[in-house]
Amino acid sequence: MDIYSKLELYDAIHRHYSRDSELITSIAKRAGNPVLELAAGTGRLAQLIVDLGYNYTGLDLSGEFIDVARAKYGKRTTFVVGDMQQFHLSKQFNFIFIGFNSFLHNLTDQEANRCLNCVRNHLTKDGLFLVSIFIPDPSFLYRETGKLYPATSLFEYDGSRCRIMETNEFDDETQVNQLTWRLERDG
């Protein structure tokens, strides 16, 4: 299942995720205005910055996701369609962050370096940069191939209580973990 092609499902899955909220808010307060989020998706984390009264810019590769984010926040924020590996904005930011494992969409060292170079070019001299990434336990990477494991708790979607089940396949050589998600309705 490609959750990036189902915007309502993407939002439903991530709606209640908040483990990163306190850290992002704390660092934003320390860094100050303005703030840039890379891989902003539909804007789940934008509200944290808006609530601080800061100028927020969100960048995402998906024009559809950016359209949803713009509809949610209107003129209180700026959302830009762009690639975190090669963006050129006309200003610098005191705080740049990439939330919820999105940095891991850079699948090679070259892609990661391009992203980090763009961040460096857009970060003020004393600015702060936060990357949230998943560091898996090896037992997660080497789970039984083809076996379904719960990936989310129950959530509401399309009038039903649902959960995501996943399988994964880890490639030792490339260090890429390929997840496949399946939506299951409860009951």
Question: PLM features: residue spans?
Answer:
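Conserved class I S-adenosyl-L-methionine
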Residues: 1-33
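A short acidic, Gly/Pro-enriched loop at the edge of an enzyme's catalytic core
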Residues: 88-95
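Conserved beta-strand signature within the Rossmann-like core of class I S-adenosyl-L-methionine
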Residues: 126-133
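A conserved beta-strand element that flanks and buttresses the S-adenosyl-L-methionine
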Residues: 97-99
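Class I SAM-dependent methyltransferase SAM/SAH-binding core
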Residues: 47-86
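SAM-dependent methyltransferase
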Residues: 133-187
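A short glycine-rich, Lys/Arg-flanked "PGG" loop and its adjoining helix->strand segment in the class I
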Residues: 113-125
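Class I SAM-dependent methyltransferase "Motif I" SAM/SAH-binding loop
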Residues: 39-43
